[in-house]
From Swiss-Prot:
Metal-binding in keyword set: yes
Residue positions of motif CLIR: 131-134
Coiled coil: 132-368
GO molecular function, one term: zinc ion binding
Chain sites annotated for binding Zn(2+): 444, 447, 460, 464
Biological role: Xenophagy-specific receptor required for autophagy-mediated intracellular bacteria degradation. Acts as an effector protein of galectin-sensed membrane damage that restricts the proliferation of infecting pathogens upon entry into the cytosol by targeting galectin-associated bacteria for autophagy. Initially orchestrates bacteria targeting to autophagosomes and subsequently ensures pathogen degradation by regulating pathogen-containing autophagosome maturation. May play a role in ruffle formation and actin cytoskeleton organization and seems to negatively regulate constitutive secretion.
Pfam families: SKICH
GO terms under biological process: positive regulation of autophagosome maturation; xenophagy
Protein family per UniProt: Belongs to the CALCOCO family.
Short sequence motif LIR-like: positions: 201-204
Protein name: Calcium-binding and coiled-coil domain-containing protein 2
Alphabetized UniProt keyword annotations: Autophagy, Coiled coil, Cytoplasm, Cytoplasmic vesicle, Cytoskeleton, Membrane, Metal-binding, Zinc, Zinc-finger
Source organism phylogeny: Eukaryota, Metazoa, Chordata, Craniata, Vertebrata
Length: 470
């Protein structure tokens, strides 16, 4: 017996498969401590495998995992009847339980079941010496209960026996039908053999005629070979054109994707330029406010200087009047302090104005850089559009040269000129941070109208699209 576990299944077996292996010469009981030989026969529709096995199962088992012991069903018996031997060491102990042989295939499915048997000593015959048994009332009651259980088991076994007998009758009938079918098939085989001989003769005659036709059609064969070679060459050309066409399609898709990325970047830079223009406008407003405050302070400073001059003139005229001079000096000191405070405020405002001017210069320079980047991207988009148009022409030419493979035409979405143009570009030698702020000029390709607001320009283009669809 092999040391590893046999193939089993957790599923409950189907009883319709139990008749594929038939057990024979099964005793009603076997003596414990002695090897048991199990005999079985395969039916004509069953094909055994090397991993098939025979096991001893306790009656009322549910799955093939509940075996008590097992041996491999692979044996070298030449006859129809096979046999395997269960060693006494692995057999169940003596008891009143019933067991049965089961044949299990390599998938863990039951293919044959034997009648039940017991492992117990044989009961002595009536002619043997009688033995006087003295039992108590409890033992007698237990024996009666045990006898009742045995009678129930015997009744169940009788029922199983009737079922098995019916199955055997059905199997015998099936075997008889199969024998008749075999005889019919043998007769058909003889008839087929005769027809096969006739067909062989016809085949020989046809082969002779075929040889004659081959001799006659030698030149045609050469033409067919030449045509096949030409067809193969054309197919190779078509395959190479298809590969080239697929490559061009992939390049076209890559360019299309790159163009979409550039459009997204262009839109992003346009939004940034618009935001920076708004920041520049805010800084201009702040600068105008600061200049207004600066002008007001200058006017106030001029008034104070005029008053200071008047006070000095009054001091020169009223040097003789001590009290007036003292009062005037006190007023002059107060006004001097006020003037120093206002001069400090003016210096602070001048520093703030310088900072704002530097920020405006930086933003103007950044805006000019953004405009240059957008112009470069527009030029790149025009170049990509021309390249896509060139690829489309190549695809159209290849599609027209291959009639069985219709090519795809990819329309260039960037054939028209760029809709956005930037006016007032910085002239050579002009600093990016000039005093004037340049505005983005957008021109409509349909009617030639110019716009400074990007949203108004988009709405105008959308109106043209609606008119064209109507």
């Amino acid at each position: 017996m092999a040391s590893d576990a046999p193939p089993t299944s957790m599923l409950q077996p189907e009883e319709r498969n139990y008749s594929q292996v038939v057990f024979s010469r099964v005793e009603q009981s076997y003596v414990p401590g002695i090897d048991i030989i199990c005999y079985f026969t395969y039916t004509s529709g069953f094909h055994p495998a090397k991993k098939d096995w025979v096991g001893i199962f306790k009656v009322s088992w549910k799955t093939t995992r509940e075996y008590y012991t097992w041996v491999s069903a692979d044996c070298e018996e030449q006859g129809l009847e096979k046999r395997v031997t269960f060693k006494a060491y692995y057999l169940p102990k003596e008891s009143d339980d019933y067991y049965q042989f089961c044949y299990v295939d390599q998938k863990g499915e039951v293919r044959g079941v034997s009648i039940p048997f017991q492992l117990c000593r044989k009961i002595q015959d009536e002619g043997e010496e009688d033995i006087l048994l003295v039992t108590t009332e409890e033992e007698a009651q237990g024996m009666k209960e045990k006898q009742r259980v045995l009678e129930e088991k015997v009744a169940a076994l009788e029922k199983d026996k009737c079922t098995l007998q019916d199955e055997c009758t059905q199997l015998a009938l099936e075997q008889k039908n199969k024998a008749a079918l075999i005889e019919s098939l043998q007769a058909q085989q003889l008839e087929c053999a005769k027809k096969n001989e006739e067909l062989d003769q016809q085949n020989q005659e046809l082969e002779r005629q075929l040889e004659e036709e081959k001799c006659k059609n030698g030149s045609l064969h050469l033409k067919v070979v030449s045509a096949e070679e030409e067809r193969e060459r054309v197919q190779n050309d078509i395959r190479s054109l298809q590969l080239e066409q697929n490559q061009l399609k992939e390049e076209n898709m890559e360019l299309h994707k790159h163009t979409n990325d550039m459009e997204f970047s262009l839109k992003k830079y346009s939004e940034e330029a618009k935001n920076q223009e708004e920041e520049v406008q805010e800084l201009k407003d702040k600068l105008w406010d600061a200049e207004a405050k600066h002008h007001l302070l200058q006017v106030q400073l001029q008034d104070i200087q005029m008053e200071k001059k008047k006070d000095k003139y009054s001091i020169e005229l009223l040097t003789k009047e001590a009290e007036k001079v003292a009062d005037l000096r006190q007023n002059l000191e107060k006004k001097d302090k006020t003037m120093e405070t206002m001069e400090k405020q003016l210096a602070q405002l001048q520093r703030e104005n310088a900072t704002v001017l530097r920020q405006m210069e930086d933003l103007s320079y950044t805006l000019e850089l953004r405009k240059a980047e957008i112009s470069d991207m527009q030029q790149q988009r025009v170049r990509d559009g021309a390249e896509i148009e060139h690829l489309n022409r190549l695809l159209t030419e290849q599609s027209s040269s291959t009639p069985r493979n219709q090519g795809l035409f990819f329309q260039n979405p960037y054939e028209s000129e760029s809709l956005i143009s930037f006016a007032n570009e910085p002239q050579p030698g002009e600093a990016p941070g000039g005093s004037s702020v340049r505005h983005v000029q957008m021109q409509c390709p349909e009617c030639g109208s110019e716009f400074e607001n990007f949203q108004v320009f988009q709405d105008h283009i959308f109106c043209h699209d609606l008119e064209s669809t109507e």
